[in-house]
């Protein structure tokens, strides 16, 4: 699938290296892997994406999903969701496993539609 900009379409579950700075206060900062959590229909239409950072230095909290990506254990930090422009997506790194993607969607549903 090809996106509007001519590159590969950004899809839910894809992991990109994303530039998150500037950040304020306790927001996760710097350039780090993030998983796209917005639906494909939104991704194709808007050119902005809802992402959740991945981190290896996290504690297990209710809104963080344990994951393994590129050989490293970590967490999807769903309490730090951000909407970012395509320009912040530096490089596609891969995608989360289907099992982890389902867990992410389950936690998001619990967060927003309890």
What kind of region is each of these model predictions?
Residues 1-114:
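Conserved functional hotspots at enzyme active or ligand-binding sites that engage polyanionic ligands
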């Amino acid at each position: 699938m090809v996106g509007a900009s001519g590159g590969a379409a950004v899809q839910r579950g894809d992991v990109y290296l994303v530039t998150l700075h500037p950040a304020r206060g306790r927001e996760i900062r710097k350039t780090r892997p993030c998983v796209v959590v917005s639906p494909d229909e939104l991704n194709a239409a808007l050119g902005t994406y809802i992402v959740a950072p991945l981190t290896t230095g996290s504690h297990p909290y209710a809104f963080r999903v344990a994951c393994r990506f590129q050989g490293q254990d970590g967490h999807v930090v769903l309490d730090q969701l951000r909407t970012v422009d395509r320009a912040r997506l530096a490089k596609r790194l891969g995608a989360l496993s289907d099992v982890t993607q389902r867990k992410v969607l389950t936690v998001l549903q619990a967060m927003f539609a309890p």
